[in-house]
Regions:
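A short hydrophobic/small-residue beta-strand
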Residues: 47-48, 142
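A short SAM/SAH-binding and catalytic strip from SAM-dependent methyltransferases
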Residues: 12-29
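C-terminal lobe and adjacent flexible extensions of AdoMet/dcAdoMet transferase-like proteins
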Residues: 118-168
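A short glycine-rich, Lys/Arg-flanked "PGG" loop and its adjoining helix->strand segment in the class I
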Residues: 29-46
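A short acidic, Gly/Pro-enriched loop at the edge of an enzyme's catalytic core
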Residues: 3-14
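Short aromatic-enriched loop/helix-cap "lid" or pocket-rim segments at secondary-structure transitions
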Residues: 9-11, 59-64, 157
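SAM-dependent methyltransferase
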Residues: 51-132
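A short, glycine/Asx- and small/polar-enriched loop/turn
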Residues: 9, 97-99, 156-161
Length: 168
């Protein structure tokens, strides 16, 4: 996977979008991805990093255990298959901003057969401060810091923490 494999080099742009850092288990893994992105970019190349904005303590809705929630990755496919995704928080370390979840994906095929896959996952919701530090430590100059997808400046109340950074 992205943590273990070598990344090719010489790119003009690397995109780490759509909360992709949330899919990694720890701050150390997330910083590793920033470092690998730096190695993949040529000098002067750009890095786009996009995450939901959560500063300070782990948000209260990330601390509720035992509730199975339907995720946005659900819906109908072109062939008539139905996909439903669920997550249930099973463990929380609020001080270190870590959560473990039980994830389940169910696919009901047009003929009625259901295929299901369940797996465990750990997440570390990153803060803007962490990302800023990793960027600076890995030779990036932050060109812009946006707070949403329309390009509004980042504030403490922004829904997103989006960085546009240039490799020095």
């Amino acid at each position: 996977d992205a943590l273990e494999r070598e990344w090719q080099r010489g790119y003009d742009l690397v995109i780490l979008g759509g909360n992709c850092l949330y899919e990694l288990a720890t701050a150390e893994e997330q910083e590793t991805i920033i470092r690998k992105a730096a190695g993949a970019l040529k000098r002067g190349g750009f890095l786009f990093v996009d995450n939901a904005h959560m500063e300070g303590e782990l948000a209260p809705d990330w601390q509720v255990t035992g509730q199975r929630r339907k995720l946005g990755l659900s819906g109908a496919c072109a062939d008539g298959s139905q996909v439903e995704s669920f997550a249930e928080i099973t463990w929380v370390d609020a001080a270190n901003r870590l959560v473990r979840l039980r994830r389940r994906v169910e696919i009901t095929l047009p003929g009625g057969e259901t295929i299901a896959q369940e797996y465990e996952q750990q997440k570390h919701p990153v803060s803007a401060g962490e990302v800023r530090g990793w960027l600076e430590q890995n030779g990036f100059e932050i060109q812009q810091h946006y707070g949403d997808y329309t390009g509004s400046p980042y504030t403490d109340n922004s829904p997103r923490a989006i960085f546009w950074a240039r490799k020095g």
